[in-house]
């Protein structure tokens, strides 16, 4: 995380992680791994040093303070490389030891980074100043961050715990430990603050809160002020030190919201209530009350505001500078309000606090001449008694003269002053402690909400390990607690560490480090440990601290390595023994331990407390029971003297609860460190910190880490950092996996290969190896840098040397020239040369100047031309840029349009595909739903059957269980009776031993025979059950087949109707028949494969059922074993209770022998403790018994042996006590040693107990076997007879029920068939009527259309006639006016007119005749239509009546079906029950026969042994008669058995035969069913495909129809009148077609629409052709109309004949309409919707095509513009090249001019300076102008390049547009091809329908055959059942 990522922490960032700059500075710090070390120091523990020398195992080093020291080599510890400075996780240190940890903490603390990780720990150092690391900004930054993603912080620990709780669904705990003043309480507050912020439940809790209460978050936070007021105090180290431990559980709901909280407290330091050291003070609440912030409190408590007036609270300091007691009082009082304390509860707590202060002021004195105490004034006692609700006199009397129970009486005992003062202090402490505990309970009650809670996070704030100069009982308890917590941490830490190794695949032997501390824990808590001995001593009234010490030394000194004798040092307090804890050796002083452990109270005063009028006080002591508390009834004497609990026992109990809580959570550890004793910020006291690191387990964790692999690096990081050690191992050019690279690199290095391991993602290192690698890396880097430096220095030296050589050569040349010049400078010729040479140059310069002037003028002219050219080019460039921008805008617009068009096109295509997919998906879903519905129905029935069977099984099991329970109780009663009679039966046992052997042999033989017969019966039963199951399955499949047959019949009728509609298109579909046959073959093959798979699955299911039955049998066996073990456990419990009674008797005898002495009490206590221990051990053994049967038996035996030997030992002890009463003390020591031996020899005792139990069982079995052998047989016979009679009765009832149900079934079946026949007749009649009605309607529509056409023709003839008459009138007028001039013309015209008139009249006559005939036809048709309408109405009424009747019939049929199904299910259940009963009957008969055989065997043996069992005959009585009767019964049963056996064999043979038939029929039926279902599915799928194809064809035809309509409109403009007539006729024709399609082809609605569209298209094409020959069309139309008129007349006559047939067809059609109406309406709606979508798609496609065309035109324009720009660019390039050439010429000219200028300067140095200056100025101007021109030229070149680049881009874009247009055109072509393909598919679908129809007929025929076979099989099954029932009844009658 870099500096930028740390910005989220705001101002806290510098206090959490060092910056990048600091990290870089640390890594560049000089460091020598071999010399930089830590050495030990007396004052600083360790200091940094550099090694100077090593000699003879010693090292001389110089410390950082300049001091030279010499130490042993093993005391020197290496420093870590600089990269590990201020590391955040100290477990990652390569050298992991104490000084490294210390200095890492010190360096981080110096930078105010107070939190540091140490493996699983988080170590925090108290900064003693406020740091900005707890702000809301920091809380938000840590929320949701992993531990590795953020710096160390208590918030990180909290958030990780919270996240683990949510993700792992596991409770969490945070353990915060440390010394007083280390910051435990503050960190606990921060944890609670964090949880309250991130897991707040919001307004929900606010709504629920009552007035005066806060939210749950506020209550959790406000619990701290209340606890701190009563539980915190000032100590030497800490002004606000918690003097108790607490475990706060914060409960969360399932979503992570706060739900509730509770608090548990431990080890409150109650001694502080009455005593404080000088630098300390009492609990805060006392001083808060005295602060006078609430004066009413002082008045209520009768106190002043001066602390020194009260002795208990003024022994130390009374004020603290950092605490404002007045403000704290208000905070405490407010906290009580928020927590819901009532005013009475608050005042009661304040009163008890004030009473404690008054208690400390009570004074007592000795009576004169007596040693008894009496009150010295009663004022304080009166105040205390008033506040506590007591009587003052009773209180003083109870303190000075308490009542003590002696024997059975109470006596008053006198107390001296010291005893009274001690009692007063003890009472004050008890009141305060109980009040504190009550307050915690009351807070828990408030925090306990009714909201659901699922997980919790516990926060443990408890004191750390304490090693003081004076360590007492409190330190032992605290250190014992920390020892347990450290063991818990060690176990958890290295379990996680080793789980990491396991996860990474590292070979590792598990080490349980939790056992390292077990020896010390056992020494403290185990029996005969320190706590145990302390409690034992507390039971002895005369025991002292020294006797306690003597017992400790006797039991542990020299026997336990952790127990030592201390070395007392002068000046230090005395120590009595030492313990070796994990944190170090602690010396303990045992003075006062017995008193502290017993913590006795004045029971007289406690009795007053219990009767107090102050409710709180009486509540606190309500459950107090002292040593003399009365014994409860029924508890015996075992409770006497042990009803009070010692402090150590209570502490251990609480600690065990805490450890149980912690073990059930995932822990997180926080260790708080106090840096110095002076509370100085930034100062760290090294010895103090090291002491704490040892005490709080940080160094213990380091010790564990060092044994593993503490350093680990990811493979990639390792390869990157350490590749430099051997680059050859990982070549640069080739790819090598990071892990392989790391393995190669490490294997190539000279290091110990056992020091590292390779995991799956990381490489693990032992401690120190990473530092060695860092050292090797530094050495490698130093060598490389040294080599680079050497090479660099060599290169620099060679460069310098080369410069020196060049300088030397130059100097030599100069020297040679100077020497030569000095040698010739005085020659005369040389002088002459010096004079003439300048003159020659001046003449040449004049010539050059002239030429330069000419050149200058020429250049000036060229410059002017170039300027003009440049301006022209600039103007052109501006225009080109403008054009270019325009083109860019146009191209951009075209691109946008094209992109939009493409997007719309893609969207349209996607929408189309989605719609098609949706249609297909809906159809598939419909099919799947139907299939699922059928499957679910079948499964439901099957599950109901199974449920009924399971219920019966459960009932049987319950009956069996009840029987077993009764037998168990009877057996237990027998065991008790036999135990009592065991002594009397010993003699009988001796006599019956021989008889027992013979009976055992006979019994064994009988058992073997019985087992064999049972095996046979089991096999037969299994076979029969299997057959019955198959019969049930066949019956179920038969019922299902009947339903399928009904469905198929309905489908058949539906398909027959479809057949009539599809016969017109059958011929077109025959071409694809072969393809469909091939597909059918493939489907058949797949179906066979599926059937094979189904059979395999059924076989697997049967196997699983067998396994299930076996497992159930195994479960029953295990339950029996468990029951046996429970009985054995009950026996052991009984023995244990007997032993306990004997132990109590021994104790009573001891009490009677020794009286009420303390020794006897001690002995009783000891015996009771031992007995409780034995009970715990026994209970643990019992629990282990239930885990495993083998271990259970063994441990039972051991426990019984142990108890037996304990009895012997206790009896020996009793004898010794009775004989040696005078030496009781010595004998007590012997008993103690004997008890230790008993504990050690526990295993041997358990074995002996097992032996005793075996002997007892043998005696018992000997006594029982003879009696049981006869009693069992007698009882079994009676039981079998009763069960047999019951089963016979049940069987008769079931058979009667079956016969009744069978008769009902036959009746229902007959009624159902009659109803079916009636229904079929009604349906046929209804279909016929519907068909007739539809035909009549169609004929009526045709006649109406013809009539309308004839009417129009008549009107047309009328118009022609009127026109002719008008022409005649015109000619007549014209003839009258021109009669004279044009007589001849008139005559000719008259002739012509007469001729035409005659023709017109003939036409009129014809038309009139035709009209009259049409009128007659019209009237006749109208009459017929009226008749037909009447018939139609009648048909409709009949159809409605039939529909109503049909619906009623359907209801009746549904009710009968339901009744039939119910009766069928009842029949099946009864049949199953009958079958189960028959199988049970067979079992019972077999068992009965076997028992008879056993009886026969026993009879023979009894005859042989008649003489030896004479004594038995007296006991058995009438056994001979019973056997004789049983013999008769046996013979009868044998005969019945033979008959039943033969009947069973016949039934099995017939069943096998029928089973074969049924299996074959079922297989054929399944094949037929599967084929029908497959074909139906294919048919549905093809219909759906055809439907989709038709929709697509409609779309394509619609587009072509639109085009044809446009062309037709253009042609029809020529003949508008004829077009109108034609349109009207087409409209009428299309209307008629639609009416016909709706009436006849509703199943194929889409196909009819397609045909209508095709007809319209054909008509449009024909109209387009016919309009070219207008006259011929009209004549043909007239002829057609006349022909149609004649046809209509014939049709009318035919309609009259076929009306009856139409009525029948009307009925059939109406039925089909009702069946298919719902489907058609949904399909029509879908079609309309898809038509609308497709029309929209077509319009959008047309728009897209139009836009593409526009884009193409624009692209063409852009291409032409680009070509023009390319030409202009070429011209510009030519101009640029010309300018470039001119530039080069000018540069050459300038060079020449410069050369001439140099020569002119030498010639005219003296005279031409002015002219030279002018020329130079001119040259500079020319140069400037040239540079400007060059810049402009460069800019123009850049502009031309940009234009050229833009032209290329435009050209490329144009090409892309053209390609897009081509793609769109291809897409349109593909769509058209798809339309054609869809047409072909529609034709294929119609052809396939014909094929499916033929196959359906074939399947129907096969189905009929299968039904016949099924009926035959069913009749045979019924016969077999009847036969089996007859056999059963016959056998029962014979019995």
Curated annotation (Swiss-Prot):
GO molecular function term, any single one: microfilament motor activity
Coiled coil region boundaries: 839-1935
Effect after changing residue 1426 to K: In CMD1S; uncertain significance
Domain Myosin motor: 85-778
Comment on protein domains: The rodlike tail sequence is highly repetitive, showing cycles of a 28-residue repeat pattern composed of 4 heptapeptides, characteristic for alpha-helical coiled coils. Four skip residues (Skip1: Thr-1188, Skip2: Glu-1385, Skip3: Glu-1582 and Skip4: Gly-1807) introduce discontinuities in the coiled-coil heptad repeats.
Domain Myosin N-terminal SH3-like: residue ranges: 32-81
Chain residue ranges for the region called Actin-binding: 655-677, 757-771
In-chain residues carrying the UniProt-annotated modification N6,N6,N6-trimethyllysine: 129
SUPFAM superfamilies on file: Myosin rod fragments, P-loop containing nucleoside triphosphate hydrolases
Recorded consequence of changing residue 1459 to N: In CMH1 and CMD1S; likely benign
Protein's UniProt name: Myosin-7
UniProt-listed InterPro entries: IQ_motif_EF-hand-BS, Kinesin_motor_dom_sf, Myosin_head_motor_dom-like, Myosin_N, Myosin_S1_N, Myosin_tail, P-loop_NTPase, XRCC4-like_C
Chain positions found as Phosphoserine: 1137, 1269, 1510
Gene it is expressed from: MYH7
GO cellular component: cytoplasm; muscle myosin complex; myofibril; myosin complex; myosin filament; myosin II complex; sarcomere; stress fiber
Biased composition (Basic and acidic residues): 1923-1935
Effect of residue 441 to M: In MPD1; uncertain significance
Consequence of substituting residue 1820 to W: In CMYO7B; uncertain significance
